[in-house]
From Swiss-Prot:
Cross-referenced SUPFAM superfamilies: Nucleoporin domain, WD40 repeat-like
Subcellular location: Nucleus, Nucleolus
Additional comment: Present with 9620 molecules/cell in log phase SD medium.
Descriptive protein name: U3 small nucleolar RNA-associated protein 12
Length: 943
């Protein structure tokens, strides 16, 4: 009988406050009690999106899309990480760009995905809505800019003149676009003609930032230089719309990553910041025109007093022009490297700014601002969100006996989490933690550090009970408890294994003389010295054996009671990083930096199997309770589920974005927890769904085939390769259509071809029957032809062939429709034209879906015009002419209806205004107007 296993799926992911994408600030909602406050911040949390309340530090909501990793229908690849966020506040839309080039548009009110766009081949670097929120512009690492229509749900066109990643753009209405790239160029695009009309060298190296305020444009490069440009869109002179005005130096020598403007609505004072690729943000104030004029006048006067000529004065003023426009304001310095920033509010007394850091925190700053006081106070950090995540990598995790609490240890902090609510309930300061363990009862946690310290924490009192600073002379890499929890075993890089006992001692209460409290303390018992550094120690569940991994690539097994040597397990080529022993103490597994897992028997020390398990160092292995199945995690960012008896991989769990450092298994085996370098903590829960090994292997092979097929289509290889653009010559234009083959578009094309096969066969069968019937009616020879029986599918859905094909077309997303049509071979193009010809005879269907029919027909003809022109089939020519005539008639009728309806609406509006709108006019002005107006001529009535 085929063996089945229970499937593990991701039940939760937490611990990430802000990942690599930018942050978006939204003001406090009007539903709040006071309607004010620092508002909310939208941040990326790897593949998800978090919305935080800045004041309370609470997670308001989390936006997640798609199947959970590990699900039966989930793809065998890690989910794409969010790379850019952009919100349109008037429409409550949030556009999210991902590392695989996908763009999803969310509705912030309903927390659902409205639109999916897939046109880029690399990660999204920039997104921007237009003023109305009906168009979205995206930039990517593939050097292309795409303009998307949110109403039509399609990509309008692709601008592809840059040679490297897009780093900035600015859009004015529907006419102009300015873009910068890492190729060092700044380009001005005319969006009406889709052409680049100006190109300038922005910086000698890469250009990293762009921002525009009125006619002022600022760009940043790879060094401390910042360029100021003058923007004059109305200038018709060739190359005169964008001119360089000057250069100024910022304080930081690192590149400027982002520039953003903000204006005080009360006094029209404008500020901007430059986010540097370090721990600083520099803010600047833009001087008003009166200030600039006064400064120029004073400078000119001083230069004249020095005896300079008019030319020298003009040259000097031009060189220092940037100092007249900009005034350095304040510099914000964070403790951590800054990932992104955003202005929040500005008033006459302060500026407020929020930022996210590389250490998984959100910081909110207030910059005091006094007009009359040039020496403003330093920026103040008013809010911080850091409780729900750790600053550095989680190196060790453990689960309490009752499966309710989770301990995570990192450099500088130990956090205790509620597994059910995923909230941090305790935070302790500690050293550089390498290993931690819950004591029986779940109220005490023991922790080992890189400095050789042992620290014992009490969760109930939130205090540090005991610290042994000289527990070891080097890093404590591993610790374990005996099954009764009374003894502790620690292994260190000082080549010793130490045994500790827990004892209760009376401790003097601080501030008293004779009051004592019982406190649990650690007491050193014995020491086992070995020849090499110890990386891992593990006590068998029956307390019989102690397994120790050494730096010499071996694992030595001792009897725990007598400390006598029992077995030496050798065979790994690199040090063993993790050990675990099965529940029956009969099997031991070891994982190593050589990417292998070895399964050994503890009776004779024989190696049952050696598995090449991962693509990088395997950091941890854990048996499931009461089972020989086990989990492993690696630096290749994958968690794997194995059968230790059949030596087969049951599941590959892709979710983490980077190295997975630690694993912990619940005492009942109901869930597994993993932690990673990406700051995320993920809970993998056992489900009722069953896993069959053969099905998983087939699924993996299918995914590999699909990926290969998509790659061949994109690169132009294989029989079903991508066809060239309709322009056809192979010359790369600055603008092109938005096309990208995806698995969804391929499947949509296949569904359409199946519908065409079924529908056209039915249509041709009916046409043949009608011809035979007419011939029989004329000659009356033989028996009358039998009407063919309809297709069972059409009878079941009660539709005609053309209705069935039209329904299939309607079910394809608009953003995938053209890509689905591009998949069809030319034989199916002819069938599609036959379908259009049939629809022309069905006036009801034609007028109901005229826009869709026209769009598909025009695209098919444009895309296949060379093949169609070369056809010598007279029937095809007649068919196309017939379609042209019928379509023109239908479009003319629709145009007439539209004109009639527009005029009718205008008349209704006029009548409504006459009845409801009244204009109040001054009596004196009205009399004067009537007296000045010409008297109308009176015509007599002739009877």
């Amino acid at each position: 009988m085929v063996k089945s296993y229970q499937r593990f799926e991701q039940a939760a992911a937490f611990g990430v406050i802000a990942s690599n994408a930018n942050c978006v600030w939204i003001p406090a909602s009007s539903g709040n009690s006071n309607g004010s406050g620092p508002g909310q911040l939208i941040t990326s949390a790897l593949e998800d999106v978090n919305i935080w309340d800045i004041k309370t530090g609470d997670l308001v909501s989390k936006l997640s899309d798609g199947l959970p990793p590990g699900a039966s229908d989930a793809r065998g690849a890690k989910p794409a990480e969010c790379t850019y966020l952009e919100a349109h506040k008037d429409t409550d839309l949030l556009a999210v760009g991902y590392a695989d080039g996908v763009i999803k548009v969310w509705d912030l009110m309903s927390k659902t995905v409205l639109l999916n766009f897939n046109g880029h081949k690399a990660a999204i670097t920039l997104l921007q809505f237009d003023g109305t929120g009906t168009r979205l512009i995206s930039g990517s690492k593939d050097s292309n800019i795409i303009v998307w229509d949110l109403v039509g749900e399609v990509g309008l066109y692709k601008l592809r003149s840059h040679k490297d990643s897009i780093t900035g753009f600015w859009c004015q209405g529907e006419d102009w676009l300015i873009s910068t790239s890492k190729d060092g160029m700044i380009k001005l695009w005319d969006l009406k003609t889709h052409q680049c009309i100006e190109t300038h060298i922005a910086h000698t190296g890469e250009c990293w930032g762009l921002a525009v305020k009125d006619d002022l444009l600022i760009t940043t490069g790879t060094d401390s230089q910042v360029k100021i440009w003058k923007l004059d869109i109305e200038n018709d002179k060739m190359g005169g719309k964008l001119t360089e005005m000057g250069i100024f130096e910022k304080q930081s020598k690192q590149r400027g990553l982002k520039i953003e403007f903000i204006t005080n609505s009360s006094d029209k004072t404008s500020f901007f910041y430059i986010q540097n690729a370090d721990k600083t943000i520099e803010t600047f104030r833009i001087r008003k025109e009166e200030e600039i004029a006064r400064g120029l006048k004073k400078r000119e006067k001083r230069l004249k007093e020095k005896g300079l000529t008019e030319e020298e004065i003009a040259k000097s003023i031009k060189e220092s022009y940037s100092s007249f426009i900009l005034h350095p304001f304040q510099t914000i310095r964070s403790l951590y490297k800054i990932k992104s920033a955003s202005w929040t509010t500005v008033s006459s007394s302060k500026l407020e700014l929020v930022l996210t850091t590389s250490s998984n925190t959100i910081e909110y700053y207030s910059i005091p601002y006094e007009k009359r006081d040039p020496t403003s106070p330093a920026p103040l950090k008013t809010h911080t969100i850091e409780l729900q995540g750790q600053r550095t990598d989680v190196r060790s995790i453990d689960i309490s006996d009752d499966n309710k609490l989770l301990a995570t240890a990192s450099n500088g902090s130990l956090k205790i989490w509620n597994i059910k609510t995923h909230k941090c309930i305790r935070t302790f300061e500690c050293g550089y933690a390498l290993t931690c363990k819950f004591l029986p009862g779940g109220l005490l946690v023991i922790l080992g550090t890189r400095n050789g310290e042992l620290q014992l924490f009490d969760l109930a009192s939130s205090s540090l009970l005991d610290t042994i600073e000289d527990a070891h002379d080097a890093a404590i890499w591993s610790l374990d408890l005996t099954s009764d929890g009374k003894r502790l075993v620690t292994g260190s890089a000082d080549k010793t294994v130490k045994f500790w006992d827990f004892k209760v001692e009376n401790s003097l209460v601080p501030g008293t003389k004779n009051k004592f409290l019982p406190v649990l303390k650690l007491h050193h018992d014995t020491t086992l010295e070995l020849t090499d550094d110890i990386l891992c120690v593990r006590v068998s569940p029956d307390d019989r054996y102690l397994a120790i991994s050494l730096l010499d690539n071996t694992v030595k097994v001792f009897f725990l009671d007598s400390m006598k040597f029992y077995l030496s397990l050798y065979g790994h080529k690199l040090p063993v990083l993790s050990i675990d022993i099965s529940f029956d103490s009969k099997m031991i597994i070891t994982s190593s930096a050589d990417k292998n897992i070895k399964i050994w028997g503890l009776d004779f020390g024989d190696c049952h199997k050696s598995l090449f398990a991962h693509q990088d160092s395997i950091m941890n292995v854990k048996f499931l309770p009461q089972s020989h199945n086990f989990f492993s995690c690696s630096k290749d960012a994958v968690v794997k589920y194995w059968d230790g008896e059949k030596f087969e991989c049951i599941q590959k769990l892709y979710a983490h974005q980077s190295e997975v450092w630690a694993l912990a298994v619940a005492t009942d085996g109901g869930f597994v927890v993993s932690s990673s370098h990406d700051h995320s903590i993920r809970i993998w829960e056992e489900t009722e769904d069953q896993v069959f090994l053969e099905e998983e292997k087939e699924k993996e092979l299918e995914e590999q085939y699909e990926d290969t097929l998509l790659t061949s289509l994109e690169e132009g290889n294989g029989d079903d390769a991508f066809k060239a653009d309709a322009s056809g010559e192979g010359v790369e234009d600055e603008a092109s259509g938005v096309h990208k083959q995806t698995l969804e578009s391929l499947k949509a094309g296949e569904r359409l071809m199946e519908a065409l096969d079924l529908g056209i066969a039915e249509i041709e069968g009916l046409e043949a029957y009608n011809r035979d019937m007419k011939l029989w009616q004329r000659k009356k020879l033989g028996e009358a032809p039998i009407k063919p029986q309809g297709n069972a599918v059409l009878i079941a859905v009660n539709k005609t062939p053309e209705q069935y094909i039209m329904d299939t077309l309607l079910r394809i997303r608009m953003s995938q429709l053209e890509d689905a049509l591009m998949v069809m071979p030319f034989s199916y193009v002819l069938k599609f034209l036959k379908f259009i010809d049939t629809v022309m005879q069905n006036k009801t269907l034609l007028h109901s879906h005229l826009p869709l029919i026209c769009k598909n027909l025009f695209f098919i003809i444009k895309f296949n015009h060379k093949e169609l022109v070369s056809q010598k089939n007279e029937e095809l020519k007649l068919q196309i002419n017939r379609v042209k005539t019928e379509l023109r008639s239908a479009l003319k009728s629709t145009e007439d209806d539209l004109g009639f309806n527009v005029q009718g609406l205008k008349f209704v509006k006029q009548q409504w205004n006459l009845r409801h709108n009244y204009e109040f006019v001054d009596e004196y002005d009205q009399q004067e107007k009537e007296s000045n107006s010409a008297r109308k001529r009176v015509f007599g009535t002739v009877i």
